[in-house]
């Protein structure tokens, strides 16, 4: 074609159609350039044969893992050792994926100064500051640590109160790091504007 001057009959190409739902057809989170991570709920059923991203990725991953287990391949450890213990492995729930992205303690986490337990084994993390590099924590995306805490889904918060009067609705959704949206000065502002 005009934008891609390649003859498909002369190259080894295979096209896969992956009919995915759009964001409004499944529960999940959306993120924007302001670092806001906001939860949304399914608004409508998907048309036709469309399935969730999670179901598509699960199908690819489980087949790939089986292939690696049976045939081997380059760098098999990340594929064979990846955690995939969702309630419904062939279609992970968005809530479970969000909790895994947030992270949890794989062992009791203690305060280095006092030795007191600050996060119990199995508990969701409240902040990226609780992540450890010794294998005692797990997080799918460190900047999302704090988005799903022991108090629940922080992305689903809908408190639009603005007690400061500055347009900071800190109880609405969640922003990283540590839900700090609106708390940092804009680097474009002069010192007097901060």
At which residue positions do the language-model features occur?
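Non-catalytic alpha/beta scaffold blocks inside enzyme catalytic domains
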Residues: 1-102, 142-152, 157-165, 169-194
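Acidic, Ser/Thr-rich low-complexity intrinsically disordered segments
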Residues: 92-131
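Polar low-complexity intrinsically disordered regions
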Residues: 23, 109, 113-114, 122, ...
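Beta-rich carbohydrate-recognition modules and glycan-binding surfaces
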Residues: 139
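A glycine-rich, hydrophobic/aromatic-adjacent loop/helix-cap motif
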Residues: 133-136, 168
């Amino acid at each position: 074609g005009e934008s891609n001057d390649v003859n498909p009959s002369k190259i080894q190409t295979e096209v896969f159609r992956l009919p995915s739902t759009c964001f409004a057809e499944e529960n999940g989170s959306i993120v924007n350039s302001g670092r806001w991570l906001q939860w949304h709920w399914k608004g409508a059923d998907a048309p036709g044969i469309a399935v969730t991203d999670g179901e598509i990725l699960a199908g690819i991953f489980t087949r790939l893992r089986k292939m690696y287990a049976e045939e081997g391949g380059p760098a098999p450890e990340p594929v064979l050792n990846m955690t995939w213990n969702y309630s419904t492995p062939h279609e992970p729930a968005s809530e479970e994926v969000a909790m895994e992205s947030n992270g949890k303690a794989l062992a009791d986490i203690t305060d280095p100064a006092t030795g007191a337990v600050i996060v119990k084994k199995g508990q969701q993390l409240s902040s990226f500051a609780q992540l450890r590099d010794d294998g005692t924590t797990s997080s799918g995306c460190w900047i999302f640590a704090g988005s799903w805490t022991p108090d629940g889904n922080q992305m689903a918060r809908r408190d639009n109160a603005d007690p400061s009067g500055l347009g900071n609705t800190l109880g609405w959704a969640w922003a990283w790091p540590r839900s700090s949206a609106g708390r940092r000065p804009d680097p474009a502002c002069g010192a007097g504007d901060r």
